[in-house]
Every structure is written in structure tokens, then in C-alpha cells.
């Protein structure tokens, strides 16, 4: 059995937590995040800590409590420090540029690709082949990064495409005659 739910989440100073039934709202310097938790989870807020436990009558109570603890911990980190995700563009002529909340990508297609960023996510391009995504919501950052990568996934022969900065692309050997 996982014991993730038994560890409390420490709420730092400057972070405001509101519990309204199963709806949790966490507000900090990087914004405000809201999440609705499963009915099997009971959350208590006391002494700048959030504690989690199962409600009676639910078979998966501890599992749902562990999930809720991990999600709320990510929310607290997001509103205090924020999350970043770095992407690299590998390939001749592959470029990225940010204009407002739109990322313009040149990925070898006959047309440029414009990707609209959701609210709360910012992007910057330190170089033409790097994209840095920043925001408070870990799930949204990961989804935007996955959407950008899906436009041109790294291919296995030369490794060209959009990849995460920490991703290792395994390359295949070319066909021999």
C-alpha cells in the first residue's frame, strides 16, 4: 500500500487555501489554481498543513487520498515557485518565435505552425531552437509541451524534430546494402 497520503502538505506563508466541500482553491504569488477532488477524499486544513484521509464507505479511499495529496502538493509548488519545461528544435531550418501568447514554429512544413498558448502559460525563446514554457499549473505545462512536440516528433534516424530538453532520442542505424 502506498503511504503518500499520510504525509501532510506544508502550506508556506503567502499561500491562501480555501476548502469549499470538495473544491480546493489555492492562491499564491503566481496565480490561483482550483481543483475538485474525488468524493472519497477528506481534506483538513490546520496549522499551515493540509492532511488527507479516506472517507468511510469508499473502497479506494487511500488511493484517491494519495492522488489528491500529490495534486495539491503540485498546486502549492506551482503558485509559489512555478514550473518550467524546456523544448529543443533539432533540424535544419527548424525555428521558433514567440509573439504575445502565440508560438510560431517553422518545422519543415509548407506552412508555418502557430500554436495558441492557454491562459496562465508564458513562453520565451532564448535562441531560435529553444522554447521555455513557464506557468503555475503542472498539468497544463506538460500538455502544452506535449502538443508542441506532437507537431514534429523526433524521428529515429537523425533525431530531427521537437524534443524535451532532457529527452534522449535513440537513433537507429541506416539500412545497409
Curated annotation (Swiss-Prot):
Q: What does the entry list under GO cellular component?
A: cytoplasm; cytosol; cytosolic large ribosomal subunit
* S-S pairs: none
Question: Positions modified as N6-acetyllysine?
Answer: 44
Sample GO molecular function, one term: large ribosomal subunit rRNA binding
User: Which InterPro entries does this one have?
Assistant: Ribosomal_uL6-like (IPR000702), Ribosomal_uL6-like_a/b-dom_sf (IPR036789), Ribosomal_uL6_a/b-dom (IPR020040), Ribosomal_uL6_bac-type (IPR019906), Ribosomal_uL6_CS (IPR002358)
- Which Pfam family is one of this chain's hits? Ribosomal_L6
- Give an example GO biological process: response to antibiotic
> Per UniProt, which keywords does this protein have?
Acetylation, Antibiotic resistance, Ribonucleoprotein, Ribosomal protein, RNA-binding, rRNA-binding
Q: Describe its assembly.
A: Part of the 50S ribosomal subunit.
Family of this protein: Belongs to the universal ribosomal protein uL6 family.
Q: What does this protein do?
A: This protein binds directly to at least 2 domains of the 23S ribosomal RNA, thus is important in its secondary structure. It is located near the subunit interface in the base of the L7/L12 stalk, and near the tRNA binding site of the peptidyltransferase center.
* Protein name (Swiss-Prot/TrEMBL): Large ribosomal subunit protein uL6
Amino acid at each position: 500500500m502506498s503511504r503518500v497520503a499520510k504525509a501532510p502538505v506544508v502550506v508556506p506563508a503567502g499561500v491562501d487555501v480555501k476548502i469549499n466541500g470538495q473544491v480546493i482553491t489555492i492562491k499564491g504569488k503566481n496565480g490561483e489554481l482550483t481543483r475538485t477532488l474525488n468524493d472519497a477524499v477528506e481534506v483538513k486544513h490546520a496549522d499551515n498543513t493540509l492532511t488527507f484521509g479516506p472517507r468511510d464507505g469508499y473502497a479506494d479511499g487511500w488511493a484517491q487520498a494519495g492522488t489528491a495529496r500529490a495534486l495539491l502538493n503540485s498546486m502549492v509548488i506551482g503558485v509559489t515557485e512555478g514550473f518550467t519545461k524546456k523544448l529543443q528544435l533539432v533540424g535544419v531550418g527548424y525555428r521558433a518565435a514567440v509573439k504575445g501568447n502565440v508560438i510560431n514554429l517553422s518545422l519543415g512544413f509548407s506552412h508555418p505552425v502557430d500554436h495558441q498558448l492557454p491562459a496562465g502559460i508564458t513562453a520565451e525563446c532564448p535562441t531560435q531552437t529553444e522554447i521555455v514554457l513557464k506557468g503555475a499549473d503542472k498539468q497544463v505545462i506538460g500538455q502544452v509541451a506535449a502538443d508542441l512536440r506532437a507537431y514534429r516528433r523526433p524521428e529515429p534516424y537523425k533525431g530531427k524534430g521537437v524534443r524535451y530538453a532532457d529527452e534522449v532520442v535513440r537513433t537507429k542505424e541506416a539500412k545497409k546494402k
